[in-house]
Curated annotation (Swiss-Prot):
Its main location: secreted. Insecticidal to house crickets. It induces an excitatory slow-onset impact that leads to irreversible spastic paralysis. It also modifies human voltage-gated potassium channel Kv1.5/KCNA5. Most likely, it binds to the voltage-sensing domain of the channel, suggesting it does not block the pore but prevents its opening at physiological membrane potentials. The recombinant peptide binds to the channel in an irreversible manner and slows down the hKv1.5 current activation kinetics. It is not toxic to mice, when intracranially injected (at 0.5 ug/g mouse). Expressed by the venom gland. It holds the Pfam family Toxin_34. This is Kappa-lycotoxin-Os1a. The lineage of its organism: Eukaryota, Metazoa, Ecdysozoa, Arthropoda, Chelicerata. Belongs to the neurotoxin 04 (omega-agtx) family. 01 (type I omega-agtx) subfamily. Keywords: Disulfide bond, Ion channel impairing toxin, Neurotoxin, Potassium channel impairing toxin, Secreted, Toxin, Voltage-gated potassium channel impairing toxin.
Length: 64
């Protein structure tokens, strides 16, 4: 499966590797686990997001 583009709905239970690019993470709203309608999205993270994502197995899919 290809990585999800920025703004796409992602699975908050999985790692940030599902989102495209080193700087993007799966961001979920506050108390998302308790709200049925809450969705997580791939959004730009902080500097340490890129550091944390260095070990992702699907890095070859990213261009940045």
């Amino acid at each position: 499966r290809l990585a999800l583009p920025p703004g796409a709905v992602c699975n908050g239970h999985k790692s940030d590797c599902q989102c495209f690019g080193a700087k993007y993470k799966c961001s979920c709203p506050f108390f998302w686990r308790f709200r049925k309608s809450a969705e997580c999205h791939c959004k730009k993270g902080w500097a340490w997001t890129a550091i944390k994502k260095r070990s992702c197995h699907n890095r070859y899919q990213w261009s940045d």
